[in-house]
């Protein structure tokens, strides 16, 4: 395809880059879900509560033009105060800070046993993984859109 103006160049390149960004955002989202599964849900359980396994789904992710966004949506987590799932009968809704609790560790969930829930640094691990692979993912996505990337 011959491009004869700056406007055509930006339209053609913009579409290709936008599609590539869609692909990369989706890839990052899947990697994040896998990291949560590995670092949070596969890290063992106190047995004192039933997991909802919703931390992997409580996210809005979208690509908009030439950038993308992945945002935690605490309201997507179910709150079951009687079962102490993300809330309590005493009004301690922790959905908005659940990842801070996981990152830093927490004692309250194991108040019966006195055992501390160890920190789970899933976020740092996830960022390190993305940092190590993002260039490769972007180049591959751009190539799939027909762009030659050096």
Regions found by a protein language model. Name each.
Residues 1-77, 94-150:
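Short, Lys/Arg-rich flexible segments
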Residues 76-94:
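Short, surface-exposed beta-strand/loop "edge" segments at domain boundaries and coil↔beta transitions
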């Amino acid at each position: 395809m011959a491009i004869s103006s700056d406007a055509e160049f930006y339209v053609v390149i913009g579409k290709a880059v936008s599609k590539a960004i869609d692909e990369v955002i989706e890839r990052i989202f899947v990697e994040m879900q896998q990291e949560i599964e590995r670092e949070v849900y596969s890290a063992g359980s106190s047995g004192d509560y039933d997991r909802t396994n919703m931390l992997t789904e409580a996210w809005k992710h979208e690509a908009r033009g030439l950038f993308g966004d992945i945002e935690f949506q605490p309201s997507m987590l179910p709150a079951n105060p009687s079962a102490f799932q993300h809330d309590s009968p005493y009004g301690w809704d922790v959905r908005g800070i659940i990842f801070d609790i996981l990152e830093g560790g927490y004692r309250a969930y194991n108040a019966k046993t006195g055992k501390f829930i160890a920190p789970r640094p899933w976020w740092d691990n996830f960022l390190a993984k993305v940092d190590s692979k993002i260039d490769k993912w972007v180049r591959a996505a751009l190539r799939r859109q027909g762009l030659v990337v050096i």
